[in-house]
């Protein structure tokens, strides 16, 4: 008997095997009925506000750190390099905000806060096309508004310190930047799938682990690895919002990396989880044979 099965007594005294978890049905590709549901628009609003707050806190942290460590601005000379929250603090800001916001919005919208996450879940048929598109639009608009708030509150420093925009660091090729974004987003989306897997939830129901916790830690760890390369995108809305508000040439030069990389990473993670770990291809083949 496989690990996915438990033994239950049948009505006739026999025994039969049944799953100890239930997979939700696949979301329809297009669900027109969703457009008449308030729950959809409530979820879209939640994604907008969550992404706005995410960009506001994280970009403000980046700008503040750069100001604190600017020797010419602080007058601290060589000691300025030891000031501020540091790269570790920036990574904590991103990971911590994801933990908080996913916890707050998971029951309303699923807590995506990232077009790459939404795209991966759409490919896995966890959300419909209508919901996925509305989420992505809301996330991008929320990101622009969030960075806009940072510029409004820190207008003296926003442009001077790069507006928190992602760009390819000097010394790295476009291939290296693209690869870093693909791998980083794969780690994040793979963690999302694993943390929300109904099989894991059934087996680990006795362990009080919140799904937002590993997701936030994944964001934290990826930032530590990727900040020196691209400033860490792994979220097209985050990269777009900062690029739009900052609106200088450098962030736009290689902006495609921060869309292509995360979307590819999300697609690979969705395929790996659904068709390798969850054996989706084998299940589909078995269903085809049984119906033949």
From Swiss-Prot:
PROSITE patterns listed in its UniProt record: MIP (PS00221)
Motif (NPA 2): 235-237
Motif residue range(s): NPA 1: 114-116
TM spans (from-to): 43-63, 82-102, 133-153, 175-195, 207-227, 257-277
Domain of life: Eukaryota
Disulfide bonds: none
GO annotations of cellular component type: membrane; plasma membrane
UniProt keyword annotations, A-Z: Cell membrane, Membrane, Repeat, Transmembrane, Transmembrane helix, Transport
Renumbered residue ranges of the record's region Disordered: 1-20
Membrane topology of the entry: Multi-pass membrane protein
CDD domains assigned: MIP
Chain segments annotated as coiled-coil in the UniProt record: none
A Pfam family matched in the record: MIP
A molecular-function term among this protein's GO annotations: water channel activity
Compartments, as annotated in UniProt: Cell membrane
Cited function: Aquaporins facilitate the transport of water and small neutral solutes across cell membranes.
Similarity comment text for this entry: Belongs to the MIP/aquaporin (TC 1.A.8) family. PIP (TC 1.A.8.11) subfamily.
Domain observations: Aquaporins contain two tandem repeats each containing three membrane-spanning domains and a pore-forming loop with the signature motif Asn-Pro-Ala (NPA).
Entry protein name: Aquaporin PIP2-2
Organism: Zea mays
